[in-house]
Amino acid sequence: AYDPDPYKRYSAEHTFFLL
């Protein structure tokens, strides 16, 4: 989840965590 946009990175991290 190495996205230049911190919000998108945060969202991705939580999405994978919830999965």
Swiss-Prot record:
Q: Which GO terms describe its molecular function?
A: metalloendopeptidase activity; metallopeptidase activity; toxin activity; zinc ion binding
Organism of origin: Hippasa partita (Funnel-web spider)
Q: Is Zinc included in the keywords of this UniProt record? A: yes
What does the note accompanying the cofactor annotation read?
Answer: Binds 3 Zn(2+) ions per subunit.
- For this entry, the protein name equals Zinc metalloproteinase partitagin
Q: Which cofactor does it need?
A: Zn(2+)
Annotated thermal dependence:
Optimum temperature is 37 degrees Celsius.
Cited function: Zinc metalloproteinase that causes hemorrhage in mice following intradermal injection and impairs hemostasis in its prey. In skin tissues, it degrades components of the basement membrane surrounding blood vessels and capillaries. In muscle tissue, it degrades the extracellular matrix, thus causing muscle necrosis. However, it lacks direct toxicity on myocytes. Hydrolyzes alpha-2 chain (COL4A2) of type IV collagen more slowly than the alpha-1 chain (COL4A1). Hydrolyzes fibronectin (FN1). It also impairs hemostasis by acting on fibrin(ogen) and platelets.
pH-related activity info reads:
Optimum pH is 7.6.
Q: What class of enzyme is it?
A: hydrolase
Q: Which family does it belong to?
A: Belongs to the venom metalloproteinase (M12B) family.
Enzyme Commission numbers on file: 3.4.24.-
